[in-house]
Amino acid sequence: LCAKHLGGKVFNHPHGHAEVGYYPIRPTVAGLEVVETWPECVYQWHREGFDLPPGAELLAEGDTFEVQAIRMGRAFALQFHPEVTHAMMHRWTTHGHERMQLPGARPRHTHFVDRAVYDYSARAWLDVFLERWIRG
């Protein structure tokens, strides 16, 4: 939503792939200036990506959808969901179970197994990110 408003193009993956479950991301140098430590893998729930809007700064990238986090001034856009809770994940994977049939989507049980591995680092990242964003 934010990326589209900033002039980025939103698109489906050319091969119909989705990111549904946990996937690795890589912070850029600019991303490491925002938060020094990023989670290795983050929770995703999407089948669309977006191009880097004109004038935006790439903060993190991924393999299936390259643009994972951007900044433009004080506005940030994330492709991933560091805010996801166990209840949200249960609801999304129950009501949106058809998404797990998309190419590249992870099986439902791995969402919960991977959450036990990656949730702490994603939450720690989110705490630091929000604190720095609020302080400006």
In which residue ranges do the predicted regions lie?
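Amide-donor transfer/coupling interface in amidating biosynthetic enzymes
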Residues: 26-136
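Cysteine-nucleophile active-site neighborhood
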Residues: 1-31
